[in-house]
Design a protein with these regions (language model features):
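Hydrophobic helix-and-loop "lid/oligomerization" segment in the mid-to-C-terminal part
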Residues: 1, 14-17, 95-206
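N-terminal small/polar loop signature for handling phosphorylated ligands or for N-terminal nucleophile
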Residues: 1-35
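A generic local secondary-structure boundary/capping motif
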Residues: 6-10, 30-33, 57-60, 78-80, ...
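Structural signal for conserved beta-strand scaffold positions within catalytic alpha/beta enzyme cores
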Residues: 20, 43, 58-60, 195
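Short glycine-rich anion-binding loops that position phosphate/pyrophosphate groups of nucleotides
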Residues: 23-26, 47-49, 164-165, 199
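Short glycine-/acidic-enriched loop or helix-start segments at secondary-structure transitions
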Residues: 28-31, 53, 205
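A short helix->loop->beta-strand "cap" motif at the edges of active sites that frequently abuts
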Residues: 37-40
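Short alpha-helices
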Residues: 46-112
């Protein structure tokens, strides 16, 4: 968060190069990146569903996180990893792997995380902020989703929903909603967790 302010371009800024990270298709770009949609010169990604929409693509479908790929690129260039860079990469790797619990996590993932930790970052503070602390709105969202969840096939399929009306009622932000899609899969005995979100009236995202 202390470095977030430096990530926003000033009004009227025209970039010489545009790089997308962790984006498999142009329709997944956030709204503030849409002006650059047709001019992305490099896409760095780890999704096998990559649509190769950029001029060049750096793809490693075996990587658990794009942070791993960026780390490898930095090392290949012979550049140093500062504590600030290490912090950003650790956040990228830990969030993409669900704090190293998703099945895509590999031994290499842990080795890279260890090297980033050696750069002097406060891993405890990062993990607490990302994985052990939730806003009151986020907890209220989870409570309503659990209360309204639907079970199918003897509990093997769990369906949860995030209606637009709920987001408006609780004044939820994108930060409150982020990663809620994984909640359905936490129910014991579940083989398939499905989350339906209504981002706009008449539109449902699965």
């Amino acid at each position: 968060e202390p470095y977030a302010a430096s990530l926003w371009a000033p009004e009227g800024y025209v970039p010489q190069r545009v790089v997308s990270v962790d984006i498999a298709a142009p329709n997944l770009l956030p709204d503030n990146a849409l002006p650059y949609k047709g001019g992305i010169c490099l896409a760095i990604d780890h999704h096998g569903s990559q649509e190769f929409f950029a001029e060049r693509t750096c793809l490693d479908a075996d990587a658990a996180a794009c942070g791993e790929i960026v780390y490898d690129v930095i090392r290949a260039l012979g550049a140093s990893v500062t504590p600030e860079i290490a912090m950003a990469l650790y956040v990228a790797v830990s969030t993409d792997t669900g704090c190293f619990v998703y099945t895509n996590t590999t031994a290499r993932t842990h080795r890279i995380a260890a090297e980033l930790m050696d750069c002097g970052i406060d891993v405890g503070a990062v993990n607490k902020a990302l994985f052990r602390t939730k806003s009151a709105v986020r907890l209220a969202m989870e409570a309503r989703m659990v209360a309204d969840m639907e079970l199918y096939d003897n509990g093997r399929v769990v369906v949860m929903s995030i209606p637009l009306s709920l987001c408006r009622e609780l004044h939820a932000t994108e930060a409150d909603i982020e990663e809620l899609s994984s909640l359905a899969a936490l129910v014991q005995g579940t083989d398939c967790g499905i989350t339906l979100r209504e981002p706009k009236p008449g539109r449902v995202k699965i």
